[in-house]
Amino acid sequence: MNNKSLLYPVASTSRRVVSLDGMWRFRFDPKSEGVDADWANGLPESISMPVPASFCDFFTDKESREYCGDFWYETDFFVPGEWSGKDIAIRFGSATHHARVFVNGVEVAQHEGGFLPFDAVVTDIVRYNQYNKLSVLLNNELNEYMLPAGNTATLSNGKKVAAPYFDFYNYAGIHRPVKLMALPAERVLDYSVKHRLTADGAEVDYTVTTNGSHDVTVELYDGTTKVAEASGKEGTLVVKDAKLWNVHAAYLYNIVIRIHDGSAIVDEYTEKIGIRTFEIQNGHFLLNGKPVYLRGFGKHEDADIRGRGLDLATVKRDYELMKWIGANCFRTSHYPYAEELYQMADEEGFLIIDEVPAVGFMESTMNFLAANQGNGKKVGWFEKETTPQLLANHKDALTDMIDRDKNHASVIAWSILNEPQCTSEGTEAYFKTLFDLAHELDPQKRPRTYAIVMMSLPHNSKGQQFADFISLNRYYGWYVMGGMGIVDAEAAFRKEMDGWAKVLNGRPMIFTEYGADTMPTEHKLPSVMWSQEYQNEYLDMNHNVFDSYDFVQGELVWNFADFQTTEGIMRANGNKKGIFTRQRQPKDAAFHFRARWTSLPLDYKGNK
């Protein structure tokens, strides 16, 4: 049986979890010689490197920061003798982008994709009561079949350079926690829940997957009080007077799943879950049957020095800022985030649109970062010669994202792609496959969407009919008709909106991106583009448009904070559309948003 499991590592009476985070050994491998040279049995001439973190911004020389190719991590871990008889596994929260894992010189796993977890069972390879060697060979090169998409160029000096088709920096490394686990041979591999509200409480339907045949029980606890129980791998928990999970009023129960062999407990897995429903009816988003207007951000996992590496201090600051400003939602642009962010969203009562890392799916000549550097290669997406491998990778990432995140109360929708080229032949078949797969995989049948790029309009967006709600990325007043032209920008914006009104067929619309680059030190009277005054004028124009259309049911501004991108003439040390600086301090627009969002009722437009 396939023992793959994306359950978050939790210690229990039957499970042991040890963190392997810390200072590892590290070195580049520009000639790709490490495997043949047996570096998996000992990494020569290494330097120290923190895990989790991106390697890039620790270096002071550009060649190291921009390194593209193979690179290695190595550490040692101890396996206690009392773990004998259990399955020993090593789990990576993520590693960017292509990974090969070795234990004591033996290859134990390979993984493609830099934003989702994977593990390796190493029971037969580890040595007990002594230290073992863990080596990881990573590669951060980009290609047109991967998520996210790009290519890799070679300079005249022979050095490789990443040419992303996406507008964020190609950070690389072991970005999320690494865990050593001791697991029972027969164990819980997965579970799923879906919720129904009843007149006197709620019902939680569950399904449990194990790798054995022993009996299963499921219990639900409110603190230390058991409020529901059931037996069997499928069943229903009946919760009287259920306390529902809600926006900024999150309530979490503990679900406890056990495998029994007579009176003995073979395995126990526990996790926090919230009871809530989310659906679309009559053009509105309904949380627990009540309308909710989405307000918040597109974000990035991005911060000074650690790059894309998980940093709980930054995560905490971000949530405090989002609470302060009155936000209730964010999109995990443009990839699934670390699991710890979803856990905090569950705790704090934030809504998440969860996005697979399908970004850069346009002709690269249309991507100003790649084209600006001369690295653009004209590629039409969803063509016959590119689709099979791309689609296979896309399906794998979508499957793992839903498998990992399906039980989070905070996750309300799936975003299948960001700004794809959706006007070309092959779009409809490609999109239908993925939207159908998302519906099939998700027990809760959450709404599905994708972020529609500026040049995709109501009459030529061939995939929009598959979306349960429309998500637009629009930059009227910035990339088009900026400055004095903002008056014409508003007119053009409204003309497009009138076109969308004819094809929505009762679906709601949200804006998943809108924003203007703004230097935090730039004030100008009268305003000019890049000044804080212009950012506020731009936002006012957009909000006037949003407020004019009842079918607009959400606004997620781009971006929460300034973030790093590939260098180029269009980016001044990164994307500066943040409402906060990269150091998480407010620009003037933050106070602008706080005034707006804290005054809008949760059910804004809910009766229209």
Locate predicted features.
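Substrate-binding/catalytic cleft of secreted carbohydrate-active enzymes
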Residues: 207, 319-321, 329-599, 605-606
